[in-house]
């Protein structure tokens, strides 16, 4: 179908789409007041490290400080904008990213027009890119260097197809952009090279048969341009290469960090069906080349085919022992796939409009074809933004995505400013993912953030994230690889303790049951007067911990006017059970009648003999409570999420109640199998296959002292305020509607019980 739109009108519409793209993206970014995305804080911490310390390879704030392997091209450009204009980082960063994201619209238009001389495909491609969900998500989660790098790759591929530019100018532009790309984003550089190097080889192969001198020169010109680009970036590459090698030696990218490897496999693997589906547009470009240009293997068809297939196949690189966030590789496929859809739509419109000649008088064919093309194009442009197609995000979906990635509003940013102004410059913070990245970036304080391992890369970040997640959630963790026991300590009645069982279906252990000190109740007589005491109501006296090569345990003692209460939690290194004992010592003229436990369970309860089982079919795990010498009366509540244990004591002497709580992976959901498994479980039965069996112990007091943590900051909607308010080791220093900040009282940590 011949061109139906004049070049000047076509370019005017493309500029209008570019303008629309800017306005739409600005609206999404400003919809939350502050730009959405945790990575905005990360980028600002890199900018501050460059401006204040002049260091490209170290981030002095992010994840407690350490190596920074985020290439600084975007950050240097943005810091120049900030210094030149005086605008803050949270304004400069998204503005730069919005500009480059919108330039992708023009790149889509120019690439499609240059590659295939079709009437409306370039405009459809530009419109689709303007509303591309994947590009918008990348902008809204703060992947600004990714946005810039993808735009540069599109611009580079456009230069590859420009044959009317002088060789000298082409080499200059390609080498400059290649060098800039290397300086901006490492993963994009790697994908770019994996596309370009096969392209050079294929061009060499097919240029031998070509009679055109330009075709024979192109591989050499492209190879020279890439080489010059590397020479431009060589000083940076020489400086950053040792840092890469050192971190790769520690397991980065090669699966050496087990936590990252497991999390990536469980959450970031791209389905093979999606990879196979991407082959359709990849090889279709060759078919389009045959129809619209003649030969099958033209430069344009080879380029677009490689552009689609290479990133898709790279998502399966875990087969070869290479690990990264594989979903990010899918962003490289978006542009060629959208161009494919635009070409397909143009082809379909042309096919339908040509069909009207069978239904129309000869003198009206051109007029009717034009009307049909206009109607069908309008329908496509209406369907894209207002449909629920997963590749596009109209206004409704766009604002939903922006809200999903929203991290800070005015109250949160007020707290960040307070941190910057009111805390020592060397104070170390612990915070949650997202908000914590803003604390490090805009509060300019070293911050350990509780980020999930699949979103981390550099080895030192994993321990920092694990420490932060644990400190915000629990005070003590006892983990032997089979079970994990968490306890909030004696100041806060919530999980006292919680038992989690390792699951095959999750990277995190699955919570199966927990007790609460406020629901462990002692019924007793003081003289002739009946009384009731919840364990949490008895003042905490001391917390002691003990570690050996075989086990770890926590001992908490409480004293009331009538009773002394001691709770002991012990985990052995190769057992699937935790020993929980409670000793109640009545004082003079006091006798204990009953002790009641409420056990919260996460699954179906099964009771027989001296044991209670808890089966969670979704997680494929089973928990178990085994009673000691005395067997309580067991009552299941109607909602089946709680079990009541009542011990009939009737004694004025010391009382000791022993429970073994544990769990195991259920290989079958068959009722007979489960009952047999529960009946055969003993303390020593479950063993770790590895000879390296050990028990890991997390003590919040020791960790905070060792790492010199000064403040805990978190959103009130994310973590318990009461957990820190009740603990004398923390002092509330800032509170608003959204955020709480606690100062760590080091002296209180040292005074509390014994550590280790």
Residue spans for each PLM region:
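Active-site lumenal/periplasmic loops and adjacent helix-entry segments of GT-C-fold
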Residues: 11-154, 397, 401-406, 429, ...
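Membrane-interface helix-loop-helix junctions at transmembrane boundaries of multi-pass membrane enzymes
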Residues: 2-9, 167-168, 207-223, 281-312, ...
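Transmembrane catalytic cores of multi-pass membrane glycosyltransferases
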Residues: 29, 36-39, 136, 144-145, ...
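Extracytoplasmic
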Residues: 106, 145, 250, 293, ...
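Membrane-interface transmembrane helices that cradle and orient dolichyl/undecaprenyl
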Residues: 153-171
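Hydrophobic/aromatic-rich transmembrane helices and adjacent perimembrane loops
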Residues: 146, 190-191, 321-356
């Amino acid at each position: 179908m011949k061109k139906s739109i004049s070049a000047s009108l076509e370019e005017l519409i493309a500029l209008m789409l570019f303008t629309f793209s800017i306005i739409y993206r600005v609206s999404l970014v400003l919809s939350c007041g502050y730009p959405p995305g945790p990575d905005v804080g990360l980028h600002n911490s890199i900018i501050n490290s460059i401006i204040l310390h002049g260091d490209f390879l170290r981030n002095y704030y992010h994840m407690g400080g350490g190596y920074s392997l985020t290439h600084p091209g975007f950050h240097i450009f943005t810091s120049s904008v900030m210094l030149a204009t005086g605008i803050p980082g949270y304004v400069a960063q998204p503005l730069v990213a919005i500009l480059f994201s919108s330039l992708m619209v023009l790149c889509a238009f120019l690439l499609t027009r240059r590659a295939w001389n079709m009437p409306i495909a370039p405009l459809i491609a530009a419109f689709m890119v303007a509303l591309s969900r994947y590009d918008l998500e990348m902008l809204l989660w703060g992947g600004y260097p990714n946005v810039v790098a993808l735009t540069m790759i599109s611009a580079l591929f456009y230069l590859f197809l420009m044959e009317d530019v002088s060789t000298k100018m082409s080499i200059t532009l390609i080498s400059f952009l290649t060098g800039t790309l290397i300086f901006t984003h490492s993963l994009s550089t790697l994908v770019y090279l994996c596309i370009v190097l096969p392209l050079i080889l294929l061009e060499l192969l097919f240029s031998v048969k070509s009679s055109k001198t330009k075709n024979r020169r192109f591989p050499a010109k492209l190879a020279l341009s890439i080489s010059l680009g590397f020479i431009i970036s060589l000083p940076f590459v020489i400086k950053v290469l040792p840092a890469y090698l050192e971190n790769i030696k520690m397991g980065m990218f090669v699966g050496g960090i087990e936590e990252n490897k497991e999390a990536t496999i469980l959450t970031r693997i791209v389905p093979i069906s999606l990879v196979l589906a991407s082959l359709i547009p990849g090889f279709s470009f060759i078919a389009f080349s045959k129809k619209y240009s003649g030969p099958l293997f033209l430069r344009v068809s080879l380029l677009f085919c490689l552009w689609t297939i290479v990133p898709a196949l790279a998502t399966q690189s875990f087969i070869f022992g290479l690990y990264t966030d594989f979903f990010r590789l899918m962003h490289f496929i978006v542009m060629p796939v959208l161009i494919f859809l635009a070409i397909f739509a143009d082809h379909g419109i042309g096919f339908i409009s040509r069909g009207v000649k069978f239904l129309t008088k000869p003198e009206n064919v051109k007029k009717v074809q034009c009307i049909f093309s206009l109607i069908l194009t309008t329908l496509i442009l209406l369907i894209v933004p207002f449909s629920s197609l997963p590749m596009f995000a109209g206004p409704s979906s766009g604002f939903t995505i922006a809200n999903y990635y929203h991290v800070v509003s005015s109250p949160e940013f007020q707290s960040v400013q307070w941190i910057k102004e009111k805390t020592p410059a060397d104070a170390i913070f612990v915070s949650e993912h997202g908000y914590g990245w803003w604390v490090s970036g805009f509060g300019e304080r070293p911050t350990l953030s509780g980020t999930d391992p699949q979103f981390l890369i550099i080895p030192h970040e994993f321990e920092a994230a694990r420490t932060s997640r644990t400190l915000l959630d629990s005070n003590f963790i006892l983990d032997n690889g089979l079970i994990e026991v968490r306890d909030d300590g004696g100041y806060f009645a919530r999980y006292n303790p919680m038992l989690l069982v390792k699951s095959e279906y999750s990277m995190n252990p699955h919570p199966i049951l927990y007790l609460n000190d406020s629901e462990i109740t002692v019924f007793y007589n003081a003289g002739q007067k009946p009384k009731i005491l919840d364990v949490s109501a008895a003042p905490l006296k001391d917390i002691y911990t003990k570690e050996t090569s075989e086990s770890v345990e926590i001992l908490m003692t409480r004293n009331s006017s009538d009773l002394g209460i001691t709770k002991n939690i012990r985990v052995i290194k190769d057992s699937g059970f935790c020993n929980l004992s409670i000793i109640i010592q009545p004082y003079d003229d006091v006798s204990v009648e009953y002790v009641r436990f409420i056990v919260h369970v996460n699954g179906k309860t099964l009771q027989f003999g001296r044991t209670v089982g808890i089966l969670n079919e979704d997680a494929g795990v089973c928990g178990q409570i085994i009673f000691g010498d005395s067997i309580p009366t067991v009552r299941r509540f109607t909602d089946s999420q709680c079990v009541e244990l009542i011990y009939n004591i009737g004694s004025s002497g010391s009382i000791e109640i022993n429970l073994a709580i544990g769990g195991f992976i259920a290989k079958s959901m068959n009722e007979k199998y489960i009952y047999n498994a529960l009946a055969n479980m003993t303390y020593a039965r479950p063993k770790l296959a590895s000879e390296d069996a050990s028990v890991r112990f997390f003590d919040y007091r020791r960790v905070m002292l060792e790492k010199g943590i000064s403040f805990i900051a978190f959103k009130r909607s994310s973590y318990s305020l009461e957990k820190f308010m009740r603990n004398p080791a923390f002092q509330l220093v800032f509170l608003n509607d959204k955020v709480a900040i606690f100062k760590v009282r080091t002296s209180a940590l040292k005074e509390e019980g014994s550590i280790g």
